[in-house]
């Protein structure tokens, strides 16, 4: 492994490099009451995943269950605790040594999207070894002091992204000794600000440990960012990296080829020094995709809204729900591609407005009515990967649908983001957004990006990314509808 990759792996910043903190258990499981009926289906699914690959006679049996659910629309995230009974095993073909019957205490996290279950986490151990707090990461509040220090927010723009360019960041003063008290206070403010409720003390304790790990991770991202961005507490700070990626991002963007689009005609590379379609009436308000990986739909409707405004003179807020329900080439909350969405709009005969076909945040039956369609598109085009030409196209033609690597966005607060290229690879794009403008802040060039995570994220719902360096793959999947 290259030296800089070894360092980034040590810092826990490469995808999947750090496991999420395990969820703590409650020892007094005998006192659990009957489970809510809605917990049974996700629990059975988790049990099925637990037993997958096990020989007959060795499969565990479900015992007691408890848990909680967090909802958005019909998307549900279940945090479950269950006891499992493992049968004794005396078959030498299956077990090397005889194994007596034992009880396991497990925690599972299951995502349910219209009955489709995904197991996000499985953590099990014998009951007698699971005591309150045992699942928490060792020294959760101070693990950062052993690996990375209280790092300065400003540092040189090191273009040579190697081991030597970041190793000095490990040699600063350690984190303060009163960090646990500070973190508890910050977490309390987070809970109040974002109206979080947790089912039990164990769940709250576990979310606190996730929060602390996330703050350490945000500090590392802050230290290695070459822009002016500030990272820290956001509404996603109590979600593990895996939860965040599964619920809000769109890995289909890097896995599926999508429909082939023709290349857009060049408008040249002469662009005004700055441009912002928000101030010119071509951009609707920031929307919120909720617990649904539907960023692709919001990116496309935002582009079509702008194209319709520029060519027809009317700004309409268009329906993402129509695409979730009626675009059969894409996968609704499980992800999609802008190129497929353009084809779906064209084949359907247009888009209805948000008022007529409102967003639900989950897939339902297609209720598109051609009579209610307010806009149409004639075609779609792929744009240049040259950022100067992209800026010129945007200034002349309107907002652009793009896809980016969302590294660091879970903790983004404000400023111009510029992660190191190895951390924000252009080949690992997983989030679709909308370019609405560009400019400079204190001589730092940026793209102004409309996101779909609500106005309580980022700069009132907007993300600012470095322009001119191909940051996070912003130039790799740019496209637009064509409205004549």
Swiss-Prot record:
Reported tissue expression: High expression levels in heart, skeletal muscle, brain, testis and ovary; moderate levels in prostate, placenta, liver and colon; and no detectable expression in peripheral leukocytes and thymus.
Disulfide bond positions: 292-333, 326-366, 424-472
Catalytic activity: The recombinant enzyme cleaves synthetic substrates with Phe and Leu (better than Val) in P2, with high specificity constant (kcat/Km) comparable to that of cathepsin L
Annotated glycan sites: 160, 195, 367, 378, 440
Enzyme class: hydrolase
Alphabetical list of Pfam families matching this protein: Inhibitor_I29, Peptidase_C1
Clinical disorder: Ceroid lipofuscinosis, neuronal, 13 (Kufs type): A form of neuronal ceroid lipofuscinosis characterized by adult onset of progressive cognitive decline and motor dysfunction leading to dementia and often early death. Some patients develop seizures. Neuronal ceroid lipofuscinoses are progressive neurodegenerative, lysosomal storage diseases characterized by intracellular accumulation of autofluorescent liposomal material. CLN13 inheritance is autosomal recessive.
Name this protein carries in UniProt: Cathepsin F
Organism placement in taxonomy: Eukaryota, Metazoa, Chordata, Craniata, Vertebrata
Gene: CTSF
């Amino acid at each position: 492994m290259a030296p800089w990759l070894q360092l980034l792996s040590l810092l826990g910043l490469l995808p999947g490099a750090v496991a999420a903190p395990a969820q703590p258990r409650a020892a007094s499981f005998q006192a659990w009451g009957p489970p809510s009926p809605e917990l049974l289906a996700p629990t059975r699914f988790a049990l099925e995943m637990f037993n997958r690959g096990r020989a007959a006679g060795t499969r565990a049996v479900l015992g007691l269950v408890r848990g909680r659910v967090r909802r958005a629309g019909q998307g549900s995230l279940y945090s479950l605790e269950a006891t499992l009974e493992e049968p004794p095993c005396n078959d030498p073909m299956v077990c090397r040594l005889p194994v007596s019957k034992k009880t396991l205490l497990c925690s599972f996290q299951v995502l349910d999207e219209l009955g489709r279950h995904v197991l996000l986490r499985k953590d099990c151990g014998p009951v007698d070894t699971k005591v309150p707090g045992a699942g928490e990461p060792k020294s959760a509040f101070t693990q950062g002091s052993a690996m990375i220090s209280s790092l300065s927010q400003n540092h040189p723009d090191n273009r040579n992204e190697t081991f030597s360019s970041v190793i000095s960041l490990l040699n600063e003063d350690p984190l303060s000794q009163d960090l646990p008290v500070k973190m508890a206070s910050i977490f309390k403010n987070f809970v109040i600000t974002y109206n979080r409720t947790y089912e039990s003390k164990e769940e709250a304790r576990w979310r606190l440990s996730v929060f602390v790990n996330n703050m350490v991770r945000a500090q590392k991202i802050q230290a290695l960012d070459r822009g002016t961005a500030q990272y820290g507490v956001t509404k996603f700070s109590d979600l593990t990296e895996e939860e965040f990626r599964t619920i809000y991002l769109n890995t289909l963007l890097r896995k599926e080829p999508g429909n082939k689009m023709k290349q857009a005609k060049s408008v040249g590379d002469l662009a005004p020094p700055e441009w912002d379609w928000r101030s010119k009436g071509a951009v609707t308000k920031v929307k919120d995709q909720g617990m649904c990986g539907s960023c692709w739909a919001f990116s496309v409707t935002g582009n079509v809204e702008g194209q319709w405004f520029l060519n027809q003179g009317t700004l309409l807020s268009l329906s993402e729900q129509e695409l979730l329900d009626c675009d059969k080439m894409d996968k609704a909350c499980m992800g999609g591609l802008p190129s497929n969405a353009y084809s779906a709009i064209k084949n359907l005969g247009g888009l209805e407005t948000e008022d007529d076909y409102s967003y639900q945040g989950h897939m339902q039956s297609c209720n598109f009515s051609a009579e209610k369609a307010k806009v149409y598109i004639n075609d779609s085009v792929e744009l240049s990967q040259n950022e100067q030409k992209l800026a010129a196209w945007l200034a002349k033609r309107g907002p652009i649908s793009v896809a980016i690597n969302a590294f660091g966005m879970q903790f983004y607060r404000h400023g111009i983001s510029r992660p190191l290229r190895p951390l924000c690879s252009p080949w690992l794009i997983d989030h679709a957004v909308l370019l609405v403008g560009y400019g400079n802040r204190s001589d730092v060039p940026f793209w102004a990006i409309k996101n779909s995570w609500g106005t309580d994220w980022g700069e009132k719902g907007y993300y600012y990314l470095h322009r001119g360096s191909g940051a996070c793959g912003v130039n790799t999947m740019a496209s637009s509808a064509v409205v004549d």
